[in-house]
Amino acid sequence: MKAIVWSKDQCPYCDQAKALLKSRNIEFEERNIMHDWTREQLLEAVPNARTVPQIFLDDELVGGFTELRTKLTESK
């Protein structure tokens, strides 16, 4: 399983999502919209995104941290 995490600095839910992925040994690519990526690129990937994190697992949009936690709990 591989993940993409759209994030920004000083975002507690982004930090929690990355920590959860690390604890499950799931590789992820972080796309920080305050550094190497833009908000426009995020909106191309997730047109209705209103918040970060926006998380993809194996190229499928999961949603934010709460949805990620639910999905990973269900797949245990």
Region locations from a protein language model:
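Thioredoxin-like thiol-disulfide oxidoreductase module
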Residues: 32-48
